[in-house]
Amino acid sequence: MEIFIHYTSLPENKTLADVVGELNEVLDDSGVVSGGEENRLDLDLEDENINPKYAQLAVKSYLQKVGFPKDTTLEIGGMEIGIYL
């Protein structure tokens, strides 16, 4: 399963490499940042048996903690969810 992070800007004092590395740590063995394009990061959940809600909550918490903008969204299965909702 894939999760897409749609963002308009990175938090202050964070590079894209910082965010990718930290997200890989957050996902641990359950997933990895697999790519992306302009203003989007693609996350691949490697274990189909893991409930995607847990990964969503972990990623959402990380994005809030490091200060992503309020218009940042997570897309799962075609549905976009704001990270501050």
Residue spans of the language-model regions?
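Short amphipathic alpha-helix segments
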Residues: 10-31
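Short, solvent-exposed polar/charged micro-motifs at secondary-structure junctions
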Residues: 42-45, 81-85
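A structural detector for beta-sheet-dominated domains
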Residues: 6-8, 46, 77
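Conserved short beta-strand edge segments in small beta-sheet-based binding/regulatory domains
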Residues: 60-84
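Structural alpha-beta junctions
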Residues: 25-34, 64-70
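Hydrophobic beta-strand residues in large extracellular and virion-surface proteins
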Residues: 2-5, 23, 43, 59, ...
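Short glycine-/aliphatic-rich beta-strand segments at the starts of folded cytosolic domains
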Residues: 1-13
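Short, intrinsically disordered low-complexity segments
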Residues: 30-61
